[in-house]
Amino acid sequence: MNICVNSLYRLSTPQFHSLYSEEVSDEALALLFSAVENGDQNCIDLLCNLALRNDNLGHRVEKFLFDLFSGKRSGSPDIDKKINQACLVLHQIANNDITKDNTEWKKLHAPSRLLYMAGSATTDLSKKIGIAHKIMGDQFAQTDQEQVGVENLWCSARMLSSDELAAATLGLVQESPLLSVNYPIGLIHPTTKENILRTQLLEKMAQSGLSENEVFLINTGDHWLICLFYKLAEKIKCLIFNTYHDLNENTKQEIIEAAKITGISENEDIDFIETNLQNNVPNGCGLFCYHTIQLLSNAGQNDPATTLREFAENFLTLSVEEQTLFNTQTRRQIYEYSLQ
């Protein structure tokens, strides 16, 4: 028994038995985590089973697996595929006639990281849609262009919805208080033609004024971009970061007119950074908005315009494979916020 357990799971027999008790030693978990990072399939299967637990340990293990799956944590090549295949096997077991009503399989019948990973692995479209329904429930679009249908939850060219972008960016702001991020908006109201950015800025200026770094996530019709108001040498600046084709002049003028509400008087204080980064990240404008907020959160006192220009320049030097990996991993990291 010692030989079998040690060869399969890198654990001693007492450590293996402890996995089925309420308390699992940090030493045993560390050994399993290390083996999983190195791609050990037996240990991946074992950890996926532990992640089913509805307690702090189960949550910790599930989060560890998802961090590997989404690229937040480094692992062996194809670690994401090994993990989601293990989750898919569990999902199949959870839905057989014997176990489908068992509460121990709760995480595979309700929105969870495990269920999301299982859904990413299945190639059966009807099962994929069934899993997506459990994860997403009923969602409604804030704009006509948003794709909230369940059939494309794992699609690599899916446009992010307002709610998904809001959940992810709110999560980032909680981790870093340096930014104030507003709920995503459309630039122009579809029926009244009201400039919604202008209205929100008027309200903020009338109430408490702008924060040191105030971020607006704006949809121009079929595209997300970042609009940042910040202070540089006690002067308010406005920065628009657009990762697709240049905006048309009407859209630019709407943003400029809204920005002047804050006291900006010179167009030179409004900076448009426009670089197409989406050739290998289709419909990835929301992903870049999320990543931009990450960058700004970690930029400290650096000039935001310099930070974002350098990012855009560096991103274009990445290989197609690296840009594609950014697309896959960032989508997974963003959707995790909607699973919490």
Curated annotation (Swiss-Prot):
Span of the signal peptide: none
EC numbers, comma separated: 3.4.22.-
GO BP terms, alphabetized: proteolysis
Record GO terms (molecular function): cysteine-type peptidase activity
NCBIfam families (alphabetical): PRK11836.1, PRK14848.1
A Pfam family assignment: ElaD_SseL-like_N
Main location, first listed in the record: secreted
Gene behind the chain: sseL
Function: Effector proteins function to alter host cell physiology and promote bacterial survival in host tissues. This protease targets the host cell ubiquitin pathway by acting as a deubiquitinase in infected host cells.
Active site, per annotation: 223, 285 (nucleophile)
UniProt entry keywords in alphabetical sequence: Host cytoplasm, Hydrolase, Protease, Secreted, Thiol protease, Virulence
Protein name according to UniProt: Deubiquitinase SseL
Subcellular location: Secreted; Host cytoplasm
Family from the record: Belongs to the peptidase C79 family.
